[in-house]
């Protein structure tokens, strides 16, 4: 039972919550969404005039920037999604100073309640810090000290799924995320993502063992942030054994 399962189970009991899954528009996270100037947005509207209305439907303007939840747009236009991917802020597409300012400002401005976010605080940010901006462990912990200082702590709770056996979890994910004839879909994409990152190239990432090493390192860092930064604002749950009643009681 992973992150999406946890989110779905919580929402089933708490339908009043506003759920922001990966790819949805989110007031804090920008994964799978664009971050564009007005000029860039106008170019995209002109270039893809045949789906202009769909693009507008999935666009939110934020103080002169345009956020398109572009993966929600279903189209057979060749390379549409690949084209809009270039306007994301993740995977090293922004220099560190600019990226940090965007991340910090969105968390600082957000003061809403009743939201349930998926992957917004750790996964997407942590991967960028490790793989693309190549911060060391101490710098990453300090980054989270600075970020958490900008968060409304009264309304913040982080549910963290912890696994004792990262390798076993990854083997299950490899198998589950395959097509109908057993071809692995997730693993090759994730392996290429790791191999092609600056960190992956520097450390010679090539195979499954390297992936296991990466996720162990990431989990260790996330647990450090929980212990040294978040404290009681985080609830650590066993990845396969959590009880919904315990989650809802928090």
Where are the model-predicted features located?
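Conserved substrate/cofactor phosphate-moiety recognition/catalytic segment
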Residues: 11-69, 127-129
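NTP-dependent small-molecule kinase module
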Residues: 185-250
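Conserved phosphate-donor/acceptor-positioning beta-strand/loop module used by diverse small-molecule
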Residues: 117-120, 137-193
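Walker A/P-loop
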Residues: 4
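A structural motif corresponding to the C-terminal end of an alpha-helix
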Residues: 109-113, 146-159, 218-236
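Glycine-rich phosphate-binding loop used to anchor ATP phosphates in small-molecule kinases
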Residues: 54-152, 162
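Short, solvent-exposed loop/turn segments at secondary-structure junctions
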Residues: 24-26, 120-124, 164-167, 241-243
């Amino acid at each position: 039972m992973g992150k999406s399962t946890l989110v779905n189970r919580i929402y089933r009991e708490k339908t009043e919550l506003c759920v922001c899954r990966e790819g949805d528009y989110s007031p804090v996270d920008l994964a799978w969404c664009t971050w564009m100037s007005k000029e860039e947005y106008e170019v995209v509207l002109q270039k893809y005039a045949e789906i202009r209305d769909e693009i507008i439907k999935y666009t939110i303007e934020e103080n002169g920037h345009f956020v398109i939840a572009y993966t929600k747009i279903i189209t057979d236009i060749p390379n549409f999604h690949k084209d809009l991917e270039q306007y994301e802020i993740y995977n090293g597409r922004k220099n560190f100073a600019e990226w940090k300012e965007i991340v910090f400002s969105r968390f600082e401005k957000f003061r809403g309640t009743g939201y349930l976010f998926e992957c917004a605080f750790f996964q997407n940010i942590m991967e960028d810090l490790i793989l693309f901006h190549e911060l060391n462990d101490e710098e990453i912990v300090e980054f989270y000290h600075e970020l958490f200082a900008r968060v409304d702590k009264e309304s913040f709770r982080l549910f963290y799924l912890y696994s004792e056996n990262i390798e076993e979890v990854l083997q299950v994910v490899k198998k589950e995320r395959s097509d109908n004839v057993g071809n692995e879909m997730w693993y090759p994409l994730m392996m290429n993502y790791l191999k092609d990152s600056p960190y992956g190239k520097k450390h010679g990432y090539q195979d499954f063992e390297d992936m296991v090493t990466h996720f162990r390192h990431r989990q260790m860092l996330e647990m450090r942030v929980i212990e040294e930064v978040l404290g009681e604002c985080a609830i650590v749950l066993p990845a396969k054994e959590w009880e919904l009643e315990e989650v809802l009681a928090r």
